[in-house]
């Protein structure tokens, strides 16, 4: 499977930290985040990479070359084959895909160049292959679902609704958001090339909701963007502490199993209605603490 990495954005929200570096070149514990992405891909057998570049493109292209060289930071080989597409003008976060579609002859992995992730990509790809949709989103819970877009899916993981943060939402909903990793079919890029900027979510993916062709792959693994100075600092700490690596499902997971009735919620006999479900005092804070420690909280 080929990987396409979108690395052409300007990173205006983090410009104070980036300076004259493109955002994918920001260091995480001494190595550019893009180098860490390439390392994760290589370790899992994804060695054919196409990077779209724009803002400060030479900084990326001169550092990585065609992938046959070695890292200036570690001295180790990059171990991948890299091609580039240079945006002459801003094309949004998906416009470049239509310009490179002749290089995409099978389903491909799409990710942003400023995202730190440590996930089992083979498991993700296997899910996509089995379900056979046009696109699969990598989805996970986050710490602020109330102001995030929500993904609603049926029991077969087919997306039925894609709610933006402005959309009305039900009183009860699952904390499931798009993490920014995707597997896409090149069939999505057929037809006329759109003019100007193209928004991946609003123009390509969201219209697939409810058609049965958009899947979501739920995972607790680590995926976090570095769009603000605060998020960048958090990512650096998560990598240094080992928290990011520990969440990869190729590794054994630490978990706390929590009984339900009378332990985390008020006992009401046989619970029949969600409106009767009431968390006991301190439970929400305890679950948050479990999550912050990097453990899985499993309710049984």
Task: Annotate each language-model stretch with its function.
Residues 52, 283, 287-300:
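Substrate-recognition element of Asp-dependent hydrolases with the DxDx(T/V) motif
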Residues 126-130, 269-288:
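Basic, amphipathic juxtamembrane/active-site segments
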Residues 108-109, 116, 122-129, 140-145, ...:
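Catalytic-core segments of class I nucleotidyltransferases/pyrophosphorylases
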Residues 45, 132, 291-294:
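Glycine-centered short loops/turns at secondary-structure junctions
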Residues 2-5, 26-113, 121-123, 228:
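Conserved N-terminal catalytic core of the sugar/cofactor nucleotidyltransferase
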